[in-house]
């Protein structure tokens, strides 16, 4: 990592030489249920996956960079299920939690004391009383509005509860680093089933059909608020079954231990048999590393794209290198399309991102703003074979200050599903054209300019 520029704390940048050095002499390696695969077997898997010139180039060049940079394995033999909204995510989570036999590990940014949060808490307490050890880690800032008594009820039931980087320094577990937040959202059941993405535990996902689901699951549904009637949240998770679950378990353990959580002893790393054919890479990023690993691998994937780059992101306040990567891809003929929010819970970030629209549009990047929903997803699909879903936003906070977690999936079948989901979001969006953008009012231009001035501090 010596090639990373100095001053990354204020201006993250990946050296052009880093890509070549990381990839040099480092063929991609794949791990399976029983350990590392042979070079011959690895090459056979990648060759089959990379049929087509564009896919072959992306896999040959970028995957070696990704693996060398993250120093974690690409794991074969997984089944990855795309969960396109809060309804699908919660239903799958409830099913997995109900079926837990040994342990449940839950790392979450926001866990609200509302109807949805109470349902999760009730179910976790029920499993704890059945003898399943539940370990919950929540972020102190993300749960500022959640009373301590909400978590105390779970503690009294025997659940291990850890508050990440407490806002109150009296509760700190070491150095008080208030600006470093645990933005990860990951649920692991019995060390074998993983949920990862952008979905928090909150009633914002509970409008419409979600209210009916919660009612069926045993909690009387409250009447939707006027806000819930008007706005639904659009988010994405994935469910992963197979050997890659162990890599997410390791990431959870490291975070848990960093906060001095109670030692976790038990069946957390069972032998995991192959469940499918998807390759999965678990990537956890930290503000304590020279550069955000998910940021590095996304920039590299964009740089090696040959056909298309489709991004969907909730909080878009991009770094100069993110903009440069997108513009360079568009100029070399790659179809670069980005779906972003039109409405948001953090307007200053929305305006900061919009301050870059003009330059992106001039380079050929197509920008769409999602309507009739608050977009909270953080996903990408590139050349139909490389996809990522997780908690990482394309903003400075995710890159510099947050702990994040993503799943990278190599699969053409899953890539097709991701492309279809992107197309659905695009169909519910309005394209921002250069002509239309030049007509925006002066007041809005000032908001965007001022927000852009402060984007690295948001």
Task: Show which residues each predicted segment covers.
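Charged, low-complexity intrinsically disordered terminal segments
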Residues: 8-458
């Amino acid at each position: 990592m010596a090639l990373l520029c100095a001053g990354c704390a204020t201006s993250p940048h990946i050296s052009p030489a880093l890509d070549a050095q990381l990839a040099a002499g480092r063929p991609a390696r794949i791990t399976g249920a029983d350990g590392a695969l042979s070079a011959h077997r690895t090459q056979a898997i990648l060759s089959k996956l990379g049929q087509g010139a564009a896919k072959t180039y992306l896999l040959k060049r970028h995957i070696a960079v990704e693996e060398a940079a993250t120093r974690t394995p690409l794991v074969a033999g997984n089944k990855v299920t795309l969960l396109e909204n809060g309804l699908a995510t919660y239903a799958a989570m409830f099913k997995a939690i109900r079926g837990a036999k040994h342990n449940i590990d839950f790392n979450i940014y926001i866990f609200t004391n509302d109807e949805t949060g109470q349902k999760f808490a009730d179910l976790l307490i029920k499993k704890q009383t059945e003898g399943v050890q539940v370990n919950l880690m929540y972020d102190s800032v993300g749960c500022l509005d959640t009373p301590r008594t909400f978590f105390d009820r779970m503690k009294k039931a025997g659940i291990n509860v850890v508050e990440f980087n407490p806002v109150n320094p009296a509760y700190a577990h070491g150095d008080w680093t208030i600006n470093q937040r645990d933005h990860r959202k990951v649920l692991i059941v019995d060390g074998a089933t993983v949920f990862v993405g952008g979905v928090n535990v909150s009633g914002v996902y509970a409008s419409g059909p979600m209210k009916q689901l919660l009612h069926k699951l045993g909690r009387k549904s409250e009447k939707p608020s006027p806000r819930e009637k008007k706005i639904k949240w659009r988010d994405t998770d994935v469910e992963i079954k197979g050997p890659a679950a162990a890599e997410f378990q390791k990431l959870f353990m490291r975070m848990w231990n960093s906060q001095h959580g109670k030692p976790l002893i038990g069946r957390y790393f069972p032998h995991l048999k192959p469940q499918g054919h998807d390759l999965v890479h678990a990537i956890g990023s930290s503000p304590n590393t020279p550069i955000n690993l998910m940021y590095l691998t996304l920039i590299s994937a964009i740089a090696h794209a040959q056909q298309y780059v489709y991004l969907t992101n909730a909080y878009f306040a991009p770094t100069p290198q993110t903009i440069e990567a997108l513009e360079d891809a568009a100029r070399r003929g790659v179809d670069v399309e980005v779906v972003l929010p039109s409405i948001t819970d953090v307007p200053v970030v929305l305006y900061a991102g919009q301050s870059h629209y003009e330059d992106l549009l001039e380079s050929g990047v197509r920008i769409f703003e999602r309507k009739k929903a608050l977009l909270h997803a953080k996903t990408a699909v590139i050349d139909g074979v490389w996809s990522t879903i997780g908690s990482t936003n394309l903003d400075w906070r995710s890159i510099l200050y947050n702990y994040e977690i993503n799943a990278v999936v190599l699969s053409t079948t899953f890539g097709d599903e991701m492309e279809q989901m992107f197309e659905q979001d695009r169909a519910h969006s309005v394209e921002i054209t250069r002509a239309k953008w030049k007509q925006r009012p002066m007041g809005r231009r000032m908001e965007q300019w001022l927000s852009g001035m402060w984007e690295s501090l948001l």
